[in-house]
Amino acid sequence: MEFETIETKKEGNLFWITLNRPDKLNALNAKLLEELDRAVSQAESDPEIRVIIITGKGKAFCAGADITQFNQLTPAEAWKFSKKGREIMDKIEALSKPTIAMINGYALGGGLELALACDIRIAAEEAQLGLPEINLGIYPGYGGTQRLTRVIGKGRALEMMMTGDRIPGKDAEKYGLVNRVVPLANLEQETRKLAEKIAKKSPISLALIKEVVNRGLDSPLLSGLALESVGWGVVFSTEDKKEGVSAFLEKREPTFKGK
């Protein structure tokens, strides 16, 4: 599949998506969003892919939406623009396969919202993260008001959105915005190491973990616990469960097939 604004690479069970507009700091335009949509659909439908990694080329992960067109948007067009971007972020969050945002530099506005749609975020020490939309007289429109608040809490999320300030990688880790921060030189190695570790696990259980956690966040506790129990029963019908238990008893590494 050919793309203009992104690059994709299949590496064993891993699928790498690299935003490829480095001269624009990988800003999100309509073409990039459409190609990102197609790329994640491709990865989701490939049974060999176990983990999806999203990163950016050059010094930015993604500097947000391409604002050059903003003054020409009518209110109706702006609503559609926001809706389209948010739907793609929703799609990434709902993928059955684990996703990792490898934040190599600036993750601002829609770029941070893209990272927030991923399950795990690993950032370089040099990374700068923020939602600066307030400085344009607007506010986040790709899910940031909701996802950031759920990740770091209301107070810190409001401060980030109301000031538009960027925070460095070390503070992002302290806030829980990213899972870990590593030197830029080690970023790809550490991301690949984590992705390969996850890729060895049962795809069915990984998908159910995502489903139960994501749905449980917006449900009463008892509903989330009930969903957890139902999913736990489901995995007992799988070949992966049999393989995992057998491997443990036989003191060997399991080989999960996603069945």
From Swiss-Prot:
Which residues does UniProt mark as catalytic? E113 (nucleophile), E133 (proton acceptor)
Cite the entry's keywords alphabetically. Fatty acid metabolism, Lipid metabolism, Lyase
Q: Name one GO biological process term.
A: fatty acid beta-oxidation
User: Which Pfam families does the annotation name?
Assistant: ECH_1
- Top EC class, one word: lyase
| Entry annotated with the keyword Plastid | no
Quaternary structure, per UniProt, is:
Monomer.
Record protein name field = 3-hydroxypropionyl-coenzyme A dehydratase
| Organism of provenance | Metallosphaera sedula (strain ATCC 51363 / DSM 5348 / JCM 9185 / NBRC 15509 / TH2)
Identify the taxonomic lineage of the organism of origin: Archaea, Thermoproteota, Thermoprotei, Sulfolobales, Sulfolobaceae
